Amino acid sequence: LHVVAPLKPKAQWPEVKAAMKALADSMSADSPDDYVSTISKAKRKGKILIDYLRNGRGATAVAPYSTRARPGAPVSMPLSFEELSPAILPNHFTVENVPSRFAGTDGDPWEDFRKAEAPLPSKLGKVRKSR
C-alpha cells in the first residue's frame, strides 16, 4: 500500500525525505513488532515496511493503474481513504476485474487530490506515544 499525500509545492526533496524518515523511525520505535524502517528483508519479516526512501528525488514507485509482474497480473489501483479495508490485499485488483471496478465508480478517486494540499509538518515523527 502506498500512501500518497499532496504537499504544498514549496516542500523541498531533502526535507520531505528527512521528515518521512523521522516518521518511519518513530513508527518503528513505537511499535517494533508491527513496523520497520529498514529495507533488509530479514529484519522486516512479518512487519510492515515504512519505506521513506520512495520520497527521495529520482526514487521510483509503481504508477497508478500499472500491471504488476506477479501471478494473476495485479493492478496498482488508486483508492480513496473510505475504500480501504482489510479485504483489499495486494492482489485484489487484477486485469480481469479492473473493468468492473471502473464501471462501478463515479470517476477518479483522486479527482480532488490537490485540494488536500498541505505544508510539510515541521514536527513529523518527533511526537512519540508513551508506553
Task: Name the predicted role of every residue range.
Residues L7-W13:
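A generic structural motif
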